[in-house]
Amino acid sequence: MRSSVYSENTYNCIRTSKEHLTERRRVAMAPMFQHFLNLCVEKFPESIEHKDTDGNGNFTTAILEREIIYIPEDDTDSIDSVDSLKCINYKLHKSRGDQVLDACVQLIDKHLGAKYRRASRIMYGNRKPWKANKLAEMKSAGLVYVCYWDNGVLGAFTSFMLTEETGLVEGDALHEVSVPVIYLYEVHVASAHRGHGIGRRLLEHALCDGVARHTRRMCDNFFGVALTVFSDNTRARRLYEALGFYRAPGSPAPASPTIRHTRHGGGRVVVPCDPLYYVYCLHMP
C-alpha cells in the first residue's frame, strides 16, 4: 500500500456492480450499533500528533483532531448512549456531514481518481461520473467515518461498516455462508501527513486491535475485518499481508496469463490477466 495507506474498499461496486450492495446485509440491531459506535469513540485516538523538520532543520508539530460521523440506519436515528459531541449523526447534521464527505471524496480523488475514472462503469454499472457514484455509496446506512483534521483541512480518514459478508469462511468460494464482519471501505492519509505511520496506526491498532477485537466479544460468530483492494495496488497489498490479511476464499483469483502472438516476427507476448480487485480478510477467532 502507498505511504498514505489508501485503500480502494468499494465493496458493492468493485465486486462487479451495485448488486453487491443488496447482497451485503448490515447488522441493524440498534443496541449493537450503539456499542459499536462507542467502541469507535473509545479506540480511535482523539488526536494524532507528529513532528516534521523544515529545510533549516527546525521542528514543526502537527496535531490532527478527530471527528466521527456515522450514517444511521432508519431505526437508529436517535442513539442516546453515544456522546453526540464525539460522534455526529449524519441525518441530524447533514450540512456538516456533506462537508465531511465532500472533503473525503476529494482526498480519494487525489489518490485514486485515475483508477476510478478508468473503472467506474464496470464498478458501478452505469455511466455516471465516478464521484457521483462514490458519494452515493459513501452515504450507505451503517458507515462510520473517523476523520482527522489539521486546522480545518482533512489530514486523514478511514471509513468502515459493521455488516455481514459471504465468501470469507474457508471453503466458502460460492458465497453461501454469511458472517458478521467489519468491512473496511477507505483508509487515506493526505500527502502533508505521510511517512508518520498514521494509516497503519488507524488500521492496525485502532480498527483491528481495538474496535474489531472488542466487537468479537459482543458479536457471536464475528469473523474479523475484510476489505477490497485494486489488484494492481501492490504496495497496499504488501501492507495488508504484513498485517496478517490474506486473499479471501471468495475473492477473485489471479487468472493464468494469456499468450498473444505479435503481428510481426512471430514473437509472443505474455499478457497478465489479473482481476480488477481482490478481497482480503483478517480472521479473528
From Swiss-Prot:
It catalyses: N-terminal L-seryl-[histone H4] + acetyl-CoA = N-terminal N(alpha)-acetyl-L-seryl-[histone H4] + CoA + H(+); N-terminal L-seryl-[histone H2A] + acetyl-CoA = N-terminal N(alpha)-acetyl-L-seryl-[histone H2A] + CoA + H(+). Keywords: Acyltransferase, Cytoplasm, Nucleus, Transferase. Substrate binds at Y116, T163, E164, E165, Y185, T228. The record marks E186 as: Essential for catalytic activity. Residues 88-274 form the N-acetyltransferase domain. PROSITE patterns: GNAT (PS51186). GO terms for cellular component: cytoplasm; nucleus. One of its GO terms (molecular function) is histone H2A acetyltransferase activity. It is an enzyme of class 2 (transferase). One of its GO terms (biological process) is heterochromatin formation. It is found in: Nucleus; Cytoplasm. Its EC number is 2.3.1.257. This is N-alpha-acetyltransferase 40. The lineage of its organism: Eukaryota, Fungi, Dikarya, Ascomycota, Saccharomycotina.
